[in-house]
Amino acid sequence: SGSCEVKTCWMQTPHFKEVGDRLLVKYQNAKRVVARNSIGGGLGLANVPKKKRKRAPPPPEDQLVFLEDSPNFCNPDGEIGIFGTKDRYCNRTSDGADRCDTMCCGRGYNIKLERRTEWCYCQF
């Protein structure tokens, strides 16, 4: 009487929130790099004084990097088609991108209360 044991291993993606949390940490720790126009190309770390510049080691494979700062979406910039957030409607109770604390970029916001009377065609 022989017995057989089977072991199966697999990889599974984490929950979506965990992926988002990890990406946020990487985004917050991203490093600016400059593209080199030399033989072999490559990327080097930015903001290094010219006198101290040496060939910087390449960023780690799992390091999030960027070439230029993101535009400021709070203020209008017609050159790149950003309208800004001034005079836009926001949602005080939202947890999303339309939340007033986020959308208004710390400038504060006005609360507008409206009272409407509408016909509801109700039947009693």
UniProtKB/Swiss-Prot annotation:
Provide the record's note on post-translational modification. Palmitoleoylation is required for efficient binding to frizzled receptors. Depalmitoleoylation leads to Wnt signaling pathway inhibition.
- What positions does the record give for glycosylation? N91
**Disulfide bonds, paired cysteine numbers:** C90-C105
Which SMART domains does this entry report, sorted A to Z? WNT1
Question: Where in the cell?
Answer: Secreted, Extracellular space, Extracellular matrix; Secreted
Which Gene3D superfamilies does this one have? 3.30.2460.20
Give the residue range of the signal peptide: none
Q: Which InterPro entries match?
A: Wnt, Wnt_C
Domain of life assignment? Eukaryota
Q: What GO molecular functions are on record for this protein? A: cytokine activity; frizzled binding
Give GO cellular component annotations, separated by semicolons: extracellular space
Q: Which UniProt keywords apply?
A: Developmental protein, Disulfide bond, Extracellular matrix, Glycoprotein, Lipoprotein, Secreted, Wnt signaling pathway
Q: Where is the lipid attached (O-palmitoleoyl serine)?
A: S1
Q: Where is this region: Disordered?
A: 40-61
Q: Name one Pfam family in it.
A: wnt
- An individual GO BP term: canonical Wnt signaling pathway
- Function per UniProt: Ligand for members of the frizzled family of seven transmembrane receptors. Functions in the canonical Wnt signaling pathway that results in activation of transcription factors of the TCF/LEF family. Required for normal embryonic development.
Q: What is this protein called?
A: Protein Wnt-3
Lineage in the entry?
Answer: Eukaryota, Metazoa, Echinodermata, Eleutherozoa, Asterozoa
